[in-house]
C-alpha cells in the first residue's frame, strides 16, 4: 500500500485532526448520550509485516476478506497472538536513525461497519480515538480522513463530510513504529494497536468545543471563585453555565452569549467545601446549549508554592504515592474502568494518596476517577528518550542524554506532547502538578514545553526530573520548573539539599525505593527526613505493579508469567519490569504492606512508662485525628496477651501532636510490647479498614542466657558415650546418636528415638539467592565466592565437664582462588537433654564485600512443616524491611512462609527472632536472630529464572542466621546503607538448638 510517510516526517505530527480539547463526552438535553462506543468484538483485523504488503483495497466500503479475523477493540495485537511481546526498560528497539524507522514496520489493518441515523447525519460527527500505538491512518467509506500519532493521547477527527446515512465503513491502519517511537522509550512492554476506546460523537452545529475551569480561594478559605472560560466553540451558541453543590442544589447559573464575545464568568461560593485527597468533595459544572449538555465534576481547591513549600488550599500537603502504568498481565495497555477502580481502591486502602502517571497520560477517564476517589496526580506527558544513552560515541553524558531535547528538528513534536497532556486534563481537580516527561536530558525543546505550560496554566506547578542532567554548557533555563526533582537519591543527598541556603525550590522524589522483587527496604530512613520537612513535596515509590505477562498454566497447574527475553526479543531488560508493589494480577507484594504502614496516618512515640503515656502525631493534612481513626491497643508479654482496649482519641489537628493515656501499665521483666492499631472510622470512605499500627517496646530483655543442662542439674540423666576417630566425634546413648564431622566443623547426624533428625550435615551459610535489589552487589558476592564457600577446619578437640560435652574447633571459610574471608572459633556444647549450644566468635576480612548473610543451615525431613517463631511477622522481615510486621508469637507453616516471587530470590526470612521451631526443631538465640524455613534451597532459588520452574526439595531448609544484610533498593537506587550490611570485623554469636520428642 502506498502511504504518504507522515510517520517519518517530524514536521507532520497530525493530519486532519481537530485541535486538542479538554476531555468530556457530551449528552443530549434529554440526558441521553450524544456518543456511542465503536469498541467491541466486531472489528476485522489483519496483521501485515510492513506497509508495502497491505492490501490497499481494505479501506473501501465494500471490502471483504475472509483472511481478516474478528478482533476486539480496544486491545493490543500482541495480546491477541500477533507479532511478539517486547519488554525494554528504555532502550530503543529499532536502530537510532530519526526520523526514519525500519521498512519492515509491522501494521495492523482494521475495519468496522457502523450505522449512522438520519438524525445523527444532521449533526457534526467526530471520531475520538483515546489511544493508538504508534501511528495510524484513518479512512471512512474509502476516503482518507487523516493521520495521527502520540500513542497515549487522544486524537479526534471530524468525519461529517465523509459520513452517510445507513452503513458506514471505518478503516484504520496502525503502524508499529513512527518517528514518535524515538519519543516513547519508556520502561514498559511495547504493545501496539487500538488499545483504548474509539467513540463516535454526534454534536450540534453550534456547540462548545473547549473550556477551562479554575478555582481560587480566599486566604481564610471561606470564599471561593469558580472561573469558567469558553476557549473554543463552533457556531454562535448561547451557553448556560450552571454550578451545583455537592448535595445537588443549584448554586448559580449564567448564560454566555458567544455572539457578543461573552466568553467567561466567575461564580462566587461562600463557605465552600474544599477538595483534597482525604475529602474528595466534588461540585458539578454544567454547560448547556439548546441541543447539548456537558457535565464536569470539579473540586474547589487551589495549588501554590510559597516560600519553598507546596500548599493545597493554603496548607502544606505531603504526596506519598506511586508511579503507575496502565498495565494488565493479559491485555497489555488495555485496562477497563473496573481494572482501574481496583487499583485505586487498593491504593486507598494502603494509605497511598498520590499517583504519577508514568510516563504518559493514563486513560482519559482515569483522572475523573482520581477526582472521585481522592488522589493527587502528577500528570506526565507521553515522552521519554532514554535510549539515547546507548548510542556509541564520546559525547558528554548531558549531550548524549539530551540529544533529542537539544535537537531543533524535534522541537514541535516535544511541545505537542505536552500540549496534548495539559489540554486534555486541565479541568481535572486531582491534577496538582504537570510533568514534562521522563529521563530525556534537558534542553531548549523541553524548556519551551515548560514555558508553554506555565503560560497556558499558571495555576499548577511544573515538574521534570531530567533537568538534573543540565550542567553549564547547554541552554539551562530552569525557570519553568517549580521544584527540584530527584530519582533514588541517598538520604544524605536530600539532607544536603535542605541544608543548602541557595536551595529555594521545594524538593520531590519522583521515584524512590525501587520495589523490585523482595523490596523495597530502607523506606523508614527516607521518611524520617521526608515526613517532618515541609519543603519536601513528597515521594513516589517505583512502582505500582509488576508488568509480567500471563501465559497460562504449566502441565502441573502453576501459573506462568513471562518477562523480558522470554519471547526471544532484543534488546530487552529481563525481569526489570517486575518492580511493583503488587504482582501483575494485583496480589500484594510484602512491599505494599511495608509502604502502607510506613505512611500510616498516625505515628506514636512513648512519652512515659508509668503512667503509660503515648504521643500521637496526626500525619493527615486536612483531617482532625478524632474524625479519622479509632485507636485500639493491646499489651503482650512474649506473645501472651496482658491487656487490650480502646483509647479515647483527643482532638488533634492535622500535623499536630497530642497525648493519650493507656489505662494499664504492666509490671514485667520480660519482652513486653504495646501495639496501637488505627482503624478508619465508620463515617469515612474507608470505614473499618485498618490503616496501620505502631508497636512500642515497653521492656526488652538484653540477652538470653543459654545454659547447658549438666549432671548437677539432672543427676538421673544418662551420660553420653564418646567415640573419637580422625573424621568424627560420635556421641551415643539409648536411642540417640550425635555425629560431629571434624572436617566440616558441624554436626552430620542427629539421631533421636532412632530417627535421624537432619537430612544433611549442618553447614555455615554465607550466601543467599540474590534479590533483585542485590543485583549489583551480587556480582561482588560471586567474585568473592560466597556462593561456593567451603570450610577448612584446622583443629578440633573434645572434652566432657559435668556431663556436658564440649567440642572446640578453629576453622576458616573461603572459596576457590580466594583467601579466607572468615576466621572463626566455635565451641559446641551438647548437654544432657540433647540441646546443642553453639558459641562462635571470629573475624571477617573487610577487604571483602559485605556478607549477604551468616548463619547455620539445617535440612529437615519434608514432613516437618509446622512453624512457630517469636519475632517480626507475619510478613517476611529484614533489618531495613520490617515496618509492616510486629514482634509477636506466630504459628504458621513452611508453605505459608514462602513468598512466591515470579523471579525466584531470597524470601520469607523473619528478623529479630528470640526463638523459632520447625516441626520438632527448637532454636533459641542469646541475641535475636533471623530465621527462615523453605522447601527450596538458595541454590534452587538462585539458578531458576521463573517461579514455575522451581522444584521443591525432598526436605525443609532451615536457616538460623546470625544476621542477614538488609534489602535496600539498589536494583535502581543507591547502594545498601552501611548500617544494614554485614561487614563488622568482629563476629560473636550464640544459639541453641534441640530436637524434642514428637512434632
Predicted stretch roles:
Residues 187-207, 556-608, 612-615, 619-627, ...:
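Catalytic cores of secreted or luminal carbohydrate-active enzymes
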Residues 1-89, 173, 246, 527, ...:
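Accessory carbohydrate-binding/adhesion or oligomerization-edge regions at the termini
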Residues 140, 222-256, 613-648, 658-661, ...:
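Beta-strand-rich binding/interaction modules
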Residues 79, 131, 176, 276, ...:
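Beta-strand/loop-rich accessory regions of lumenal/periplasmic or secreted enzymes
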Residues 1-21, 28-29, 44-48, 68, ...:
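Accessory beta-strand-rich segments of carbohydrate-active enzymes
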Residues 8, 76-79, 84, 91-98, ...:
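An acidic-aromatic loop/edge-strand motif
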Residues 1-31, 182, 292-615, 619-627, ...:
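Extended substrate-binding grooves/exosites of carbohydrate-active enzymes
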Residues 164-167, 231-304, 675-715:
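Extended acidic/polar, glycine-enriched regions
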Amino acid at each position: 500500500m502506498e502511504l504518504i510517510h507522515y510517520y517519518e516526517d517530524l514536521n507532520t505530527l497530525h493530519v486532519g485532526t481537530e485541535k486538542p480539547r479538554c476531555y468530556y463526552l457530551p449528552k443530549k438535553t434529554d440526558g441521553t448520550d450524544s456518543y456511542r462506543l465503536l469498541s467491541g468484538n466486531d472489528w476485522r483485523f489483519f496483521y501485515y509485516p510492513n506497509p508495502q504488503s497491505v492490501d490497499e483495497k481494505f479501506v473501501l466500503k465494500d471490502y471483504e476478506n475472509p483472511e481478516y479475523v474478528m478482533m476486539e477493540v480496544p486491545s493490543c495485537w500482541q495480546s491477541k497472538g500477533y507479532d511478539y511481546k517486547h519488554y525494554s526498560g528504555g532502550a530503543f528497539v529499532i536502530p537510532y536513525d530519526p526520523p526514519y524507522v525500519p521498512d519492515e514496520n509491522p501494521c495492523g489493518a482494521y475495519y468496522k461497519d457502523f450505522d449512522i441515523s438520519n438524525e445523527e447525519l444532521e449533526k457534526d460527527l467526530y471520531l475520538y480515538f483515546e489511544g493508538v500505538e504508534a501511528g495510524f491512518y484513518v479512512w471512512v467509506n474509502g476516503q482518507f480522513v487523516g493521520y495521527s500519532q502520540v500513542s497515549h493521547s487522544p486524537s479526534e477527527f471530524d468525519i461529517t463530510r465523509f459520513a452517510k446515512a445507513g452503513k458506514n465503513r471505518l478503516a484504520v491502519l496502525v503502524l508499529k513504529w513512527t518517528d514518535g517511537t524515538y519519543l516513547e522509550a519508556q520502561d514498559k512492554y511495547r504493545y501496539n494497536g487500538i488499545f483504548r476506546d474509539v467513540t463516535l460523537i454526534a454534536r450540534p452545529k453550534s456547540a462548545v468545543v473547549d473550556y477551562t475551569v479554575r478555582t481560587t480561594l480566599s486566604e481564610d478559605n471561606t470564599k471561593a471563585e469558580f472561573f469558567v472560560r469558553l476557549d473554543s466553540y463552533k457556531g454562535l451558541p448561547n451557553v448556560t453555565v450552571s454550578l451545583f453543590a455537592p448535595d445537588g442544589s443549584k448554586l448559580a447559573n449564567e448564560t454566555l452569549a458567544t455572539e457578543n464575545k461573552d466568553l467567561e464568568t466567575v461564580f462566587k461560593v461562600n463557605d465552600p467545601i474544599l477538595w483534597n485527597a482525604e475529602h474528595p468533595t466534588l461540585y458539578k459544572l454544567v454547560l448547556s446549549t439548546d441541543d447539548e449538555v456537558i457535565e464536569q465534576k470539579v473540586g474547589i481547591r487551589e495549588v501554590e508554592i510559597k516560600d519553598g513549600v507546596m500548599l493545597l488550599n493554603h496548607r502544606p500537603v505531603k504526596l506519598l504515592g506511586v508511579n503507575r502504568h496502565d498495565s494488565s498481565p493479559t491485555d497489555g495497555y488495555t485496562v477497563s474502568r473496573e481494572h482501574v477502580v481496583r487499583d485505586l481502591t487498593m491504593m486507598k486502602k494502603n494509605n497511598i494518596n498520590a499517583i504519577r502517571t508514568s510516563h504518559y497520560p493514563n486513560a482519559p477517564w482515569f483522572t475523573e476517577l482520581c477526582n472521585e476517589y481522592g488522589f493527587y496526580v502528577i500528570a506526565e506527558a507521553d515522552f521519554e528518550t532514554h535510549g539515547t544513552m546507548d548510542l556509541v560515541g564520546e559525547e558528554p553524558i548531558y549531550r548524549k542524554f539530551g540529544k533529542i531535547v537539544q535537537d531543533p528538528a524535534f522541537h514541535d513534536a516535544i511541545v505537542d506532547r505536552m500540549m496534548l497532556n495539559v489540554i486534555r486534563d486541565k479541568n481535572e481537580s486531582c491534577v496538582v502538578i504537570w510533568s514534562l516527561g521522563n529521563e530525556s536530558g534537558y534542553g531548549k525543546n523541553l524548556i519551551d514545553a515548560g514555558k508553554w505550560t506555565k503560560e497556558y496554566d499558571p495555576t499548577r506547578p511544573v515538574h521534570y526530573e531530567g533537568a538534573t542532567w543540565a550542567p553549564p554548557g547547554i541552554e539551562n533555563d530552569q525557570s519553568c520548573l517549580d521544584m527540584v526533582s530527584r530519582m533514588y537519591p541517598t538520604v544524605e543527598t536530600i539532607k544536603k539539599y535542605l541544608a543548602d541556603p541557595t536551595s529555594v525550590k521545594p524538593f520531590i522524589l519522583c521515584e524512590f525505593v525501587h520495589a523490585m522483587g523482595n523490596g523495597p527496604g530502607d523506606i523508614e530512613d527516607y521518611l524520617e527526613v521526608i515526613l517532618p520537612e515541609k519543603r519536601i513535596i513528597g515521594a513516589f515509590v517505583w512502582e505500582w505493579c509488576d508488568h509480567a505477562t500471563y501465559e497460562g498454566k504449566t502441565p502441573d497447574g502453576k501459573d506462568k508469567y513471562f518477562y523480558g527475553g522470554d519471547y526471544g526479543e532484543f534488546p530487552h531488560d529481563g525481569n526489570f519490569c517486575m518492580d511493583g508493589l503488587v504482582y501483575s494480577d494485583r496480589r500484594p507484594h510484602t512491599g505494599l504492606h511495608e509502604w502502607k504502614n510506613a505512611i500510616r496516618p498516625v505515628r506514636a512515640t512513648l512519652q512515659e512508662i508509668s503512667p503509660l503515656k503515648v504521643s500521637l502525631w496526626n500525619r493527615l493534612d486536612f483531617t482532625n485525628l478524632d474524625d479519622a481513626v479509632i485507636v485500639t491497643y493491646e499489651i503482650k508479654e512474649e506473645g501472651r496477651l496482658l491487656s487490650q482496649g480502646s483509647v479515647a482519641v483527643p482532638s488533634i489537628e492535622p500535623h499536630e501532636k497530642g497525648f493519650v493515656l493507656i489505662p494499664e501499665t504492666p509490671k514485667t521483666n520480660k519482652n513486653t510490647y504495646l501495639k496501637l492499631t488505627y482503624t478508619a472510622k465508620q463515617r469515612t470512605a474507608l470505614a473499618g479498614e485498618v490503616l496501620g499500627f505502631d508497636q512500642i517496646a515497653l521492656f526488652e530483655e538484653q540477652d538470653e542466657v543459654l545454659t547447658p543442662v549438666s549432671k548437677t542439674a539432672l543427676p538421673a540423666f544418662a551420660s553420653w558415650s564418646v567415640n573419637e576417630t580422625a573424621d568424627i566425634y560420635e556421641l551415643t546413648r539409648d536411642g540417640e546418636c550425635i555425629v560431629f564431622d571434624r572436617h566440616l566443623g558441624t554436626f552430620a547426624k542427629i539421631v533421636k528415638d532412632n530417627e535421624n533428625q537432619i537430612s544433611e550435615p549442618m553447614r555455615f551459610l554465607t550466601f543467599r539467592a540474590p534479590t533483585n535489589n542485590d543485583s549489583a552487589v551480587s556480582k561482588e558476592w560471586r567474585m568473592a565466592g560466597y556462593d561456593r564457600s567451603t570450610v577448612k577446619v584446622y583443629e578440633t578437640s573434645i572434652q566432657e565437664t559435668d556431663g556436658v560435652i564440649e567440642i572446640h574447633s578453629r576453622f576458616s571459610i573461603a572459596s576457590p582462588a580466594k583467601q579466607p574471608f572468615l576466621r572463626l572459633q566455635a565451641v559446641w556444647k551438647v548437654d544432657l537433654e540433647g540441646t546443642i549450644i553453639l558459641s562462635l566468635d571470629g573475624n571477617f576480612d573487610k577487604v571483602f564485600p559485605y556478607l549477604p548473610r551468616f548463619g547455620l543451615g539445617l535440612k529437615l525431613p519434608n514432613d516437618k512443616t509446622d512453624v512457630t517463631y517469636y519475632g517480626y511477622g507475619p510478613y517476611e522481615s529484614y533489618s531495613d524491611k520490617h515496618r509492616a510486621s510486629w514482634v509477636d508469637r506466630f504459628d504458621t507453616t513452611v508453605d505459608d512462609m514462602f513468598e512466591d516471587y515470579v523471579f525466584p530470590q531470597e524470601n520469607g526470612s523473619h528478623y529479630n527472632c528470640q526463638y523459632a521451631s520447625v516441626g520438632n526443631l527448637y532454636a533459641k538465640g542469646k541475641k535475636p536472630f533471623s530465621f527462615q524455613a523453605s522447601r527450596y534451597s538458595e541454590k534452587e532459588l538462585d539458578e531458576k529464572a521463573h517461579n514455575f520452574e522451581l522444584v521443591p526439595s525432598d526436605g525443609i531448609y532451615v536457616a538460623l542466621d546470625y544476621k542477614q544484610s538488609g534489602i535496600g533498593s539498589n536494583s535502581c537506587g543507591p547502594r545498601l546503607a552501611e548500617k544494614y550490611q554485614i561487614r563488622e570485623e568482629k563476629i560473636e554469636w550464640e544459639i541453641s538448638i534441640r530436637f524434642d520428642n514428637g512434632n
